[in-house]
């Protein structure tokens, strides 16, 4: 409802526009069907192997929290705070630019000074926190599950982090948004040269 009230649902999200461009380059003509397939695939992934960390944690037979669980949940909570702060800083920046009647400016304040996409990095770390917290539960399944099933669950658990990284950087996150930012923001290319795309770090001196 908030997005609708702000008029954000009146046009296609940039990441979907970018997907259409990618499909056209790969000679996919039925982009509407491709969009439906991708949406269904994302829903299936979210309801299956991407949910494995949550399934493991919720089905844990362990009575007390282990060290890994405490570390994982701490990373989870800190990452949520990190993402919230990043979103707040971006929103505050946009409001200030609107107040000053400045358009197409680059947000490089706060967390955005250290990575071009602190919100995506934080979201990835949220998943990593859950993965770490689920490891003790996964280990406890060794005696109750078949060896091959146990190994397959472990592989899926490891790939959850990798898949989320690829998704947040290349498919629906950083790269698609930068495709348009570089076109409409004159200073964005300079920002790209000086600031890491995903992992936080100090600015590069050219």
Describe each PLM feature range:
Residues 92-94:
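Membrane-interface helix/loop boundary segments of multi-pass membrane proteins
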């Amino acid at each position: 409802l908030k997005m609708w009230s702000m008029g954000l649902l009146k046009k296609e999200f940039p990441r979907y526009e970018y997907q259409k461009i990618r499909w056209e380059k790969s000679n996919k003509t039925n982009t509407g069907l491709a969009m439906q397939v991708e949406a269904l695939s994302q829903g299936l992934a979210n309801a299956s192997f991407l949910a494995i960390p949550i399934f493991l944690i919720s089905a844990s037979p362990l009575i007390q929290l282990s060290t890994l669980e405490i570390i994982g949940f701490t990373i989870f909570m800190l990452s949520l705070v990190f993402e919230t702060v990043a979103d707040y800083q971006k929103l505050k920046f946009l409001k200030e630019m609107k107040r000053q009647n400045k358009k197409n400016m680059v947000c490089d304040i706060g967390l955005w000074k250290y990575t071009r996409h602190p919100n995506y990095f934080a979201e990835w770390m949220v998943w990593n926190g859950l993965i770490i917290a689920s490891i003790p539960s996964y280990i406890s399944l060794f005696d109750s599950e078949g060896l091959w099933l146990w190994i397959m669950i472990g592989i899926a658990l490891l790939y959850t982090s990798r898949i989320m990284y690829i998704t947040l950087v290349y498919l629906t996150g950083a790269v698609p948004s930068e495709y348009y930012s570089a076109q409409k923001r004159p200073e964005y290319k300079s920002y790209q040269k000086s600031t890491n795309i995903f992992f936080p770090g100090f600015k590069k001196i050219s």
